[in-house]
C-alpha cells in the first residue's frame, strides 16, 4: 500500500477521482433539489411547448413570421437575428480594427494620437451605453420625406437604413455563398499541393477573375421574372417602398459593436504588427524590397499568424455582446428567450436552449478560427488559442 501512495501517477488518479465524485454528487443534489422545488410548485419540465403558437409578435425577423407561428420557429428566428447582428458587428469591427492597428503603429504623431484617443474612448465606455447612445441618434434621424439620400440609392431616416437589393431567388443566394466559401477553402488546399509559387498565383488570379463572372451570371439567371435585376428603394407616400430596410435598432447595435470591438481588435492588430522581429524587416530592405512589399509579404503574414488566437477571443466576446439588443428592443436570441420565459413559464428549458445556442455559435467560431490558425501556422511556431 505504501508503494502505491508513493506512486505519483496513482496519487493523481485518486485526486481526480475524488474531485469528480464531489462534482457529480453536487450535480445530482442540484438536480434533485430543482426537481423537488418544481414538483412543489406543480411545474413540469418538458419541451412540448415548442410546438405551441406564441401569440405575440416582434419588430424584426430575417424570416417571415406571424403570431400563429410556434415557439420552435421563434427560437430559430431569434438565433438567426443574433447571427446577423454578430456577423455584421464582427465584420465591421475587423475592418475598423485593422485601420486603427495600422494608424497606431504609424510614425505620424497625429495619426498615432488619433488612434490612441479612439481606443481609449471606445474601449473604456461600456458597450451598453454606446448602444443606447447610437440608438438615440439613429432613431432621431429625419422622417422618410426628409431622409438623407446617398446617390439616390441609399437613404437614412428615423425608420431605418434603406438600400438596394437584388430581385433574385433565395436558392441563388445560397449557391453563390457556397461557391465563394468553396473557393476560399480551395485556395489554401491547393497551395500546399503545388510546388511552384508562380503556378499557384496564376491559378489564384484566374479564379478571382472567373468567380465574379460566374456569380453575376447566377444572379442574372435567378432574377425574379418581369422585374428589374436591382430593386431600388423609392419614396412612396409617407414611407419608402422597394429595396431592403435595416431597422434603427439593428443599425445602432451594429455601429456600437463595430466601434467597441474595433478598439479591442485595433490593439490586437497593433500588437501583432509590433511582434514581427525587426531583423526580418531589415532583411527585406537588404534584399531590395520596397516598403509596400515588406508590409504585404513579410510583416502582414507574420502579424496575421500572431493575432489569430487573440482575434478568436475577440470574435467570441463580440458575438456574446449581441445580448445588449434587449436594451434597444432588438429581437435577438436573448430577447426572444426572455419574452418566451414570461409568456410560457418554461424557464429551465428556455435557459437551456439559450445556453446551448450560444455554446454552438461560439464553439463554431473557435473551431473555424483554430482551423485557419493551424493551416497558416509555420511548423514549429504554432500558437494555440
Describe every region a protein language model picked out.
Residues 1-385:
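Transmembrane alpha-helices and adjacent helix-loop boundaries
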